Amino acid sequence: MQKYAQILDLVRERNPLVHQITNYVTVNDCANMTICFGASPVMSHAPEDVVDMIKIASALVLNIGTLDEKQIEGMIAAANEAKKCGIPIVLDPVGAGATLYRTQTAERFMNEFPLAVIKGNAGEIGTLAGVSATVRGVDSGNISGDPKEIAHSLAKEYGCTVVISGAEDIISDGKRIAGVLNGVPIMGKISGTGCMASAVCGACAAVSDSMDGCITAMAALGIAGEEAAKTAKGPGSFKPAFFDAVTSLTNEQFIKSARISEYQ
Amino acid sequence: MQKYAQILDLVRERNPLVHQITNYVTVNDCANMTICFGASPVMSHAPEDVVDMIKIASALVLNIGTLDEKQIEGMIAAANEAKKCGIPIVLDPVGAGATLYRTQTAERFMNEFPLAVIKGNAGEIGTLAGVSATVRGVDSGNISGDPKEIAHSLAKEYGCTVVISGAEDIISDGKRIAGVLNGVPIMGKISGTGCMASAVCGACAAVSDSMDGCITAMAALGIAGEEAAKTAKGPGSFKPAFFDAVTSLTNEQFIKSARISEYQ
Amino acid sequence: MQKYAQILDLVRERNPLVHQITNYVTVNDCANMTICFGASPVMSHAPEDVVDMIKIASALVLNIGTLDEKQIEGMIAAANEAKKCGIPIVLDPVGAGATLYRTQTAERFMNEFPLAVIKGNAGEIGTLAGVSATVRGVDSGNISGDPKEIAHSLAKEYGCTVVISGAEDIISDGKRIAGVLNGVPIMGKISGTGCMASAVCGACAAVSDSMDGCITAMAALGIAGEEAAKTAKGPGSFKPAFFDAVTSLTNEQFIKSARISEYQ
């Protein structure tokens, strides 16, 4: 647990700038969560703007939740520069499987860029892994098959870390496979939990190995969610409490509460 | 009251996917309110994306709060597919009357698509009904004439349900006319109450007759607003309490608290 | 203090419509803060829409936080009409200095339009004033040189009011120089504080002299922030408390708590 807790510290110390090109639904939550986690968010999507911004950023997060042609242009320009600069790229393929446009765009980024992390729910990752999956809008879907196997083989194929969010988050870099059991159901009752997790995976990947970074990110948000749920009266009051809990999360609390399993 | 309360249950049971093409100001509130109400939101606006998404959606909500040409393209593609699939289309003509662009766009959708619901404030609906109306930005305006008559005749003309939000919400499908007295002034002190109501009208229209659905939606949000106002110290604390109150609203509470009048 | 407190009253009395073309990250916060402050927000960016909207607006706020070509088109159309109508234009050059695109766009608006207010952090204003500045994404940066001098000379050069936000906000109209010490560090731990301040500067500039208006805006938000920080457990709970505190801020509280220095 110590090594994961240290990643929390590293983010807070180095305050990495996380460049995010994301959907217009949860973008404010992503910005605030990035700050609460100890990093700095910057949102920029114009092809004219992203190259300069990537030069000073430490990670790039691409979230396709409200995709369009203009946004793809900006994402490509940013990803090209991120590749050149060698900073980690996180892809959140929101809604892959629900529409062909989203699936194909996600695949395009997977095939054309050296992604550090692909993070989605079971339906999205299942779709991209080519296994039978059901996706309904942007809700978490289901897959046939073992998520550990799917994460492992997709990670191996693309040389990146794959995160499948769920009751147990599964994380694999193609070698190791880990599970994170932290979290509470109310986290699924607010819009943006997945998007915020991707932002935070970006912050962690900016300061550490992607696999360890994603484990840390998922466990930290899960623990904060558990903490926030203690006082929340519903999804409305959960959200501010969640931001507070992420901000005040200590190493000690992380080490005590993290439920991380190494499966392989 | 029983039949309206049952619509609440139906939404929670069937969890309809509500496709929303909406403004970038209140989109996060709309997503969260849709979830709190028991439905699922999905936001998608690219012409390349919307057709696939509509195929799995149960309602389409078009909100013109921050309109532009690209968004209109996406709205038209989505509305065409919604028409083909026979799912209800809700139009929230935000700011109609304030600018010609908004008025004409709203009219275009009214004339070209079989809308299930048109929901706006007095100024917006008055403008679209061709009565003398004052609209100031996106604030609720005033109309000359009886809102019951205006809602009734506009609904009749377009074969849809018309909702005029206000201290008393007026709802008509061209045959019946109903009023909903639930709600509190602080609901007008946060941005997005009207947009959230439209999202929830979409959720209800997905599982029931539009007229009954809109009555249910307006009464449910009004009751939740009354509940939330009891503990709120201002608009800031009202908002999370409002989301909590919608989430925890029971049938019993709805039946006890709904103030619905059938005028015709 | 009396004259500043009266500006608070004037905003609440006249309820000016503040037209905002802004970034998609903090737009909801800007809308809500505008309402809490006693004004009315309207967001509209399409060239086809902005001209009609400006005709009924009392101020225009341009925030370049998530700039793109389409948005610049809308900003230019709106600024041209605002110039014609003689309403104050506030520019928030978010991220100027971080990318050339942002710097040049900010300069373009400074050179082509009669701005009433330029409001940014030290790095942004330093960049635009041509002094050595460091900017990191959209975070507040540093400048070499005296912020009072920089604000004063930039204000003089452009015939407008310049606000440099910081631990002490510096405000100058090229003649007077004032400082506002209100505020708390947690205001920098939520996304959007600067954007909300620009919106509120627009509301105040709509009803008063820009210099006095900006002093009032910065002091009022600072005092409300101090109040909200008393009960906040972190950035998450700070935000709703901040909105509540702005809404309930009284003249008496303003006069008692404002820490405004006139340096020249």
UniProtKB/Swiss-Prot annotation, chains A, B, C:
Cofactor field: Mg(2+)
Keyword Nucleotide-binding included in the entry's annotation: yes
Sample GO molecular function, one term: magnesium ion binding
A Pfam family of this chain: HK
Catalytic activity: 5-(2-hydroxyethyl)-4-methylthiazole + ATP = 4-methyl-5-(2-phosphooxyethyl)-thiazole + ADP + H(+)
Keyword terms, alphabetized: ATP-binding, Kinase, Magnesium, Metal-binding, Nucleotide-binding, Thiamine biosynthesis, Transferase
Keyword Cell inner membrane listed: no
Domain of life: Archaea
GO terms (BP aspect): thiamine biosynthetic process; thiamine diphosphate biosynthetic process
Enzyme Commission code(s) on record: 2.7.1.50
Binding site for ATP: K119, S165
CDD domains referenced in this protein's UniProt entry, alphabetically: THZ_kinase
Protein family membership: Belongs to the Thz kinase family.
Role of this protein: Catalyzes the phosphorylation of the hydroxyl group of 4-methyl-5-beta-hydroxyethylthiazole (THZ).
Listed name of the protein: Hydroxyethylthiazole kinase
Organism annotation: Methanocorpusculum labreanum (strain ATCC 43576 / DSM 4855 / Z)
